[in-house]
Amino acid sequence: MSQTPSSLRDLEHHSAFVERHIGPNDAEIAQMLDVVGHASLDALTDAIVPGNIKSPAPLALPEAITEEEALAKIRAIASKNQVQRNFIGQGYYGTHTPKVILRNILENPAWYTAYTPYQAEISQGRMEALINFQTLCADLTGMQIANASLLDEATAAAEAMTLAKRSAKSKSNTFFVHDAVHPQTLELLRTRAEPLDIVLRVGTPEEALQAECFGVLLQYPDSFGHIGDHAALADAVHAQGGLVAVATDLLALTLIAAPGEWGADIVVGNSQRFGVPFGFGGPHAAFMACRDAYKRSMPGRLIGVSIDAAGNPAYRLTLQTREQHIRREKATSNICTAQVLLAVMASMYAVYHGPDGLVRIARRTHRLAAILAAALRSAGVSVGDRFFDTLHVKAIDADAIHARARAAGINLRAIDSEAVGISLDETTTRADVVALAQLFGATADVDALDAATADALPQGLLRTTPFLTHPVFNTHHSEHELLRYMRSLADKDLAMDRTMIPLGSCTMKLNATAEMIPVTWPEFGAIHPLAPAEQSAGYAQLIDELEAMLVECTGYDAVSLQPNSGAQGEYAGLLAIRAYHRSRGQAHRDICLIPESAHGTNPASAQMCGMTVVVTKCDANGNVDVDDIRAKAEKYSDRLAALMITYPSTHGVFEEDVVAICEAVHAHGGQVYTDGANMNALVGVAKPGKWGSDVSHLNLHKTFCIPHGGGGPGVGPCAVKSHLAPYLPRAGIHAGEGQTAAIHGGGFNSESGNGHSSRIGGMVSAAAYGSASILPISWMYVTMMGSAGLRKATQVALLNANYIAKRLAPHYKTLYTGRNGLVAHECILDVRPLEKTSGIGAEDIAKRLIDFGFHAPTLSFPVAGTLMVEPTESESQHELDRFIDAMIQIREEIRAIEDGRLDREDNPLKHAPHTATQVSASEWTHAYPRELAAFPLPSLKQQKYWPPVARVDNVYGDKNVMCACIPVDAYKEDAEA
């Protein structure tokens, strides 16, 4: 132990978190630098990063502080938010998060650190939870199939619009929108429709009867609470070849007829009130359900049931050929990250309460609403009828009512000068009903009114069909039962709490506990997104400070935090480019150049903006072909809108010519969009806004430590140079069609000078600040790391990737390297030659890694037949070596196949992964020993992950699409079948 005297400042150790976040210690870093042949992190960085893009100065951010100091600072920020009683509704409702779900899902790294379930065998637990979610949504809506979540209700409605356009027989270009949809939904529909030349017509359902359109969107119950009978309208729309989309409320559907029963083709909504807090607008899991005929055009992830190699039921992502990572510019949507963690919470809420419990919650909510309506009517107040939980109170002095409400700590919905909305929910109490009645000069004897008041649900639209009949929704109603069920699912999966997840282009880094703690504070979770501005002063400060941090890290001039996924950030950036060109009288600029190596969301987002995608080449070294970009920029000079590139490239290298590429595009009037998916290789080292890029999206769920949640939530901020800043998404809703006029009046913190109030771009998310309640995670990360810590994190990410590439070089070729033979923060291992010599392909290696307890690297992207590895800075040398040892052992097994020591077909790679059931069976039929199957390295005998299923049959799953809970009898032993 060192006895060297230390100063008090040294002993205070303000940078302690940096050492917790970065995996290798200084001694390990020195050893790893020796392996890669460089004397220091700075020397390695200089050898990798082109000199003409490197930042000349450190980030102008404060120094690192400790976890305790950061938590105290953010607690002070949170205290500026005011938690009031909210009855605003408009798609957001109070709910009780069951504590067993809060602790064991939302606060559990086994759930929140998992990745999207591309590797089915290690994702069975969360896929079961998601298929429960799909069953919940399909059952309640009366549809045949539902997806595994979308970003929010408004974007889901926009996806329904484009699904209807693709699928309807009608040749019309008009989409009819119910004038009582939620205002944020209408606003987002306007954003999405305009670039696609879709005409929106807004009106009453009666007017829709006469409209010629390819589809109709109805709100049921509507935004003001009314429950309409739309069966005749559905028949009329179908007669014209159109489709009927419905935005709905899952809790209401426990009591009123399912949309599928009266003619809906597509149903969307938000599952937020199933146990997920307001969170100032997000994140929440939206959903889409549809008729079976449209399943192959439905956006978003879809969990299906297949079988494994032993013939047992197994879950997998199904119908993936619909998705952006495969179809690219022909994709049905640009949706990638969705809201898996929140969908899991909602599904567990339904499992915990079951159908009877949900009905009880719904009936109680409705009874309170009916009692309040009766009290108001008794005082001469005009209240709408045929409602579930929302009252439209008319012919009043709305300003006076709001003033009384605010004085009482109550928030009501602002509609106009003579009307307010009151939405009740699971959290509403008898005392709330009394207090609400008093605002209008009414008294409420709750028991007397309860005895005298009939329900307000329309008799002709009462639900008569059963729902959630599967045993999973009727078994786990005690806390012990649910606790053990959730634990059993978590045990089936591999997440970051067990192992590194070396997925290239995914940046699976530490999601520190201290970063996660503020997310569950009510000061962040209990703020309604439409609450009066003075109640969200803490959010205002948080958002200002985080935007400033991101501006400094990127070199851009302005940031929007509204996009609630990377794909939405891309879309926002491309919309800003489109609007900029139009403001200059250059609406004809519609060509978007995209390299063939780009992420699939890039071309999908471009086509959603009405752009024409032109693909550019890559050279033999994996670099963007600069000559091809120059040639195509010149060819399309008059029409060039943008170039989309990823930097460092998706091939894992820092390309030398990025500045020249930007100059070439600008010379022909185009804008440069730099995909920020690989920003983890840049923070503190280089800034895209300084080398010529005009716009980027970032992934806070990658670079800035928001966890992936098994496939969401995410945040995809859009960062731009000053000339594009006016075209960022506005943070408010325009008044129109008699609906509520504002979300913070277009910028709740305009006093800060951040420019929110001057932004005129269309909204890309339902809430003004997207998934606001998880922004504290990134704020905490930057605050605890400080300027020097962020730079060191980037440098260690570069080191870890090069360490893996160097140590694996005798066994696997790294497909692409940059100058000095180095990679960026990830490397592509070329295993294609091995398939020729042994019959073993990338998928076999991916599955065999499961036997070693690892999630596979990214499979066959960006180059088919390869593995892309990104270790991140958070992985220690020990964990890197463990992965390297596994890969070397796999290469030895392949060599044994090449040498004839293992059979070309009956070998541990072809049959991986191996389950405990298989290796412990009384009969073992394989030509290789059980021990090799189960324990290919001695260390695995100390700690072993057993996959719950053998290799999943993808072909069977796509031929036999089943996307609901597996019938219990499917689990019977073969001998009993």
Curated annotation (Swiss-Prot):
GO molecular function: glycine binding; glycine dehydrogenase (decarboxylating) activity; pyridoxal phosphate binding
EC numbers, comma separated: 1.4.4.2
Cofactor(s) listed: pyridoxal 5'-phosphate
Cellular compartments per GO CC: cytosol; glycine cleavage complex
Residue list for modification N6-(pyridoxal phosphate)lysine: K702
Keywords from the named record: Oxidoreductase, Pyridoxal phosphate
Catalytic activity, as annotated: N(6)-[(R)-lipoyl]-L-lysyl-[glycine-cleavage complex H protein] + glycine + H(+) = N(6)-[(R)-S(8)-aminomethyldihydrolipoyl]-L-lysyl-[glycine-cleavage complex H protein] + CO2
Subunit organization: The glycine cleavage system is composed of four proteins: P, T, L and H.
Its biological purpose: The glycine cleavage system catalyzes the degradation of glycine. The P protein binds the alpha-amino group of glycine through its pyridoxal phosphate cofactor; CO(2) is released and the remaining methylamine moiety is then transferred to the lipoamide cofactor of the H protein.
Protein name: Glycine dehydrogenase (decarboxylating)
Organism this protein belongs to: Xanthomonas axonopodis pv. citri (strain 306)
Highest taxon of source: Bacteria
Record HAMAP family: GcvP
Signal peptide: none
Gene: gcvP
GO biological process, alphabetically ordered: glycine decarboxylation via glycine cleavage system
Family per similarity comment: Belongs to the GcvP family.
Pfam families: GcvP2_C, GDC-P
